[in-house]
Amino acid sequence: MPALSRWASLPGPSMREAAFMYSTAVAIFLVILVAALQGSAPRESPLPYHIPLDPEGSLELSWNVSYTQEAIHFQLLVRRLKAGVLFGMSDRGELENADLVVLWTDGDTAYFADAWSDQKGQIHLDPQQDYQLLQVQRTPEGLTLLFKRPFGTCDPKDYLIEDGTVHLVYGILEEPFRSLEAINGSGLQMGLQRVQLLKPNIPEPELPSDACTMEVQAPNIQIPSQETTYWCYIKELPKGFSRHHIIKYEPIVTKGNEALVHHMEVFQCAPEMDSVPHFSGPCDSKMKPDRLNYCRHVLAAWALGAKAFYYPEEAGLAFGGPGSSRYLRLEVHYHNPLVIEGRNDSSGIRLYYTAKLRRFNAGIMELGLVYTPVMAIPPRETAFILTGYCTDKCTQLALPPSGIHIFASQLHTHLTGRKVVTVLVRDGREWEIVNQDNHYSPHFQEIRMLKKVVSVHPGDVLITSCTYNTEDRELATVGGFGILEEMCVNYVHYYPQTQLELCKSAVDAGFLQKYFHLINRFNNEDVCTCPQASVSQQFTSVPWNSFNRDVLKALYSFAPISMHCNKSSAVRFQGEWNLQPLPKVISTLEEPTPQCPTSQGRSPAGPTVVSIGGGKG
């Protein structure tokens, strides 16, 4: 427990003695921390993951994951402390119903406590203190708080830390408060940041001696003074660039812009694009050449908080050589909520590649739903589920006898997506989860390495389900490419590469017309969902009463599907793919039960008095 203290500092030892004592204490602390986290941290750092929380960079979070302890060690750096700071997690990044930890002062004494907020955002002391404060320290950079939190606490007021996206909330206290309950969240400088906290514990493979690097970077552009910008830049590979394997990539973020660069992707243009005009500018610019729309094959994707991405030692992603475009498109998403002006940037992605091709080519396969309006979400829904199938018939035909091995995944929906999950089904039984995000955000998409490689055999089924929220919409949301339309996709990265590039489904269009015919007969409203109209127009005409909603849900749960078992040429494998029955699932996976921490891992029931030294900030 930190020593009790007031704000004032006491006389100390000489500078040389203090420096020696400080360096010794830091060294001992790091040794203890590394030992406590052994097996969960790369050797070079006990806290390897870092993100800026606020746009100004005054709050920075570092962390590590201990799967043996089922806990996370957080270090929060407060560069300019005023009267305190608030940090925590909530379902979608709201201050309401949040799980919080708060450092505050009453003007005389500083306190640290586990807290929670109710539906109105009122903050309360949590009687079960699951954030364990380990150290408070002044450094040249500012004040650092080191604390520990279990993944799950079995406290109904707490957030369950799971695989996938976590919405972090933070707030800066500008003035003292007499008590925790007196803190008014509505008057705070608040913000949110999205991140994957539970990083996979995968050792970094050694790079081969012949590995080369290529930087795909923005050419010292000036970040536009607006909140959101997508910047596109075309890079051309050297003429005669032979076939290589990408084996690793990592972000290059211009120093000082860490809080502005939200995510980045590198795409390869379509093979038939033998020439693409050079371009550097906003992706929505009227000056953008149309040919850039054909640069959509993902080579690399990075999002805030992610570190380097490694391919398995036996596989690499092929690029260059015959049948491969020489043109790459970099897309950088700048998030500039403070509308900062005059900031130059050369961020991008560094590719590591080798001319010595590995045993297997890695491939990317699309799972989920076909981009079609026959799959729709009614308006004013809080959790409407759509499901796409990769059937046993397709995997039996398209996969090699030894199967494939999925090592990474990128989930994707548009604006109303809230959850995404892909489950592997074998012999009618849910076998394992490929990837799951219960707090998915369309504003935070990255290629994530899986904790465990998932092997898919011929005859297996892959089921991808997406949950949507359309509470703020008055009309049905149909499937399609538009940003106000919806998607449900899992781009899985696997090896060895096969001809199967797309394994997706949609409800049979004929059965959907039977739905429209049914509601025409059973609804008294003067509405015509007539077959001569487009499917989108038909959905627009539906009066969304409870009957029509329930019947649509039922239709999607039993009606036959149209399967798209497609090669990279967009041609389906030979076979009958229409009016296919839904795969049968006779048993499902049990929900994992969180481990409840012992009382030894908790702090005392009340606030902890802490020494933050150096005055009020």
From Swiss-Prot:
Site feature location: Cleavage: 39-40
Provide the reaction this enzyme catalyses: dopamine + 2 L-ascorbate + O2 = (R)-noradrenaline + 2 monodehydro-L-ascorbate radical + H2O
Which pathway does the protein contribute to? Catecholamine biosynthesis; (R)-noradrenaline biosynthesis; (R)-noradrenaline from dopamine: step 1/1
Per the record, its GO cellular-component terms are: centriolar satellite; chromaffin granule lumen; chromaffin granule membrane; cytoplasm; endoplasmic reticulum; extracellular region; extracellular space; intracellular membrane-bounded organelle
Cross-referenced PROSITE patterns, in alphabetical order?
CU2_MONOOXYGENASE_1, CU2_MONOOXYGENASE_2, DOMON
Write out the ranges of the annotated region (Disordered).
590-617
Q: Which CDD domains match?
A: DOMON_DOH
Cofactor section: Cu(2+)
Q: How does activity depend on pH?
A: Optimum pH is 5.2.
Please share the entry's free-text remark on the cofactor.
Answer: Binds 2 copper ions per subunit.
Q: Describe the processing and modification events after translation.
A: N-glycosylated.
Q: Which residues bind Cu(2+) A?
A: 262-263, 333
Entry GO MF terms: catalytic activity; copper ion binding; dopamine beta-monooxygenase activity; L-ascorbic acid binding
Q: Which residues are glycosylated?
A: 64, 184, 344, 566
Residues annotated for Cu(2+) B binding in this entry? 412, 414, 487
Q: How does it assemble?
A: Homotetramer; composed of two disulfide-linked dimers.
Disorder this protein is connected to according to its UniProt record? Orthostatic hypotension 1: A form of orthostatic hypotension due to congenital dopamine beta-hydroxylase deficiency. Orthostatic hypotension, also known as postural hypotension, is a finding defined as a 20-mm Hg decrease in systolic pressure or a 10-mm Hg decrease in diastolic pressure occurring 3 minutes after a person has risen from supine to standing. Symptoms include dizziness, blurred vision, and sometimes syncope.
Record family assignment: Belongs to the copper type II ascorbate-dependent monooxygenase family.
What is the protein name stated in its UniProt record?
Answer: Dopamine beta-hydroxylase
Where does this protein come from, organism-wise?
A: Homo sapiens
Please state the gene responsible for encoding this protein: DBH
